[in-house]
């Protein structure tokens, strides 16, 4: 017996309407598509900079390529030679995040839980837009700390369309 794809058109329509229904810009909607490739590491620029909030680093990824591509919706942020990476807040799994040509996405990373009574120190952190990338290393001075970066239970927001939304997402998730 042959199974008909009765749900194919409604599902495709729902995915197409997702940006409209959620208010998300079309360039940001993360519906998986075989036609959109993972951004090549050389086609994206990653930055990390100091935030006005203590122990928070602002990161960004920009698509320098000529076509839309995807990165993982959870930035990969590691700290020196410590095991593990910053955990996403809110908790989320891997999924594609679309970046139009020339577009940027932003995230906020809290390196140190304010309630922490202990911490580790590292000389650098590494940021990548996708776990398949090696990432870019940023020294302590480039993220606004003197000498070392204090780390304990680090968290990161998902990629956001603006730095302000990344800051708001971190504030909401870490109250």
What are the functions of these language-model segments?
Residues 93-99:
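Beta-strand-rich interaction surfaces with strong enrichment in secreted/lumenal proteins
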Residues 61, 71, 79, 127-129:
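Hydrophobic side chains in beta-strands
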Residues 73, 95, 121:
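Residues that flank catalytic or metal-binding motifs in active/ligand-binding sites
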Residues 59-66:
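Asparagine-centered strand-capping/turn motif at beta-strand->loop junctions
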Residues 1-55, 83-92, 105-107, 111, ...:
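Membrane engagement elements in two modes
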Residues 66-86:
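Short acidic, flexible loop segments centered on an aromatic residue
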């Amino acid at each position: 017996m042959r199974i008909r794809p009765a749900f194919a058109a409604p599902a495709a329509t729902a995915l197409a309407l997702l940006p409209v229904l959620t208010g998300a810009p079309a360039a940001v909607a993360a519906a998986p598509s075989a036609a959109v490739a993972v951004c090549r590491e050389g086609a994206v620029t990653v930055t990390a900079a100091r935030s006005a909030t203590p122990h928070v680093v602002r990161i960004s990824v920009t698509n320098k390529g000529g076509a839309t591509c995807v990165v993982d919706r959870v930035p990969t942020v590691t700290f020196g030679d410590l095991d593990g990476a910053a955990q996403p807040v809110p908790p989320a799994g891997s999924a594609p995040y679309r970046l139009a040509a020339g577009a940027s996405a932003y995230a906020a990373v809290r390196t140190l839980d304010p309630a922490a009574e202990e911490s580790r120190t590292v000389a650098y952190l590494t940021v990548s837009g996708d776990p398949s990338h090696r990432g870019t290393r940023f020294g302590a001075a480039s993220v606004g700390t003197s000498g070392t970066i204090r780390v304990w239970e680090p968290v990161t927001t998902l990629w956001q369309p603006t730095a302000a939304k990344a800051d708001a997402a971190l504030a909401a998730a870490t109250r």
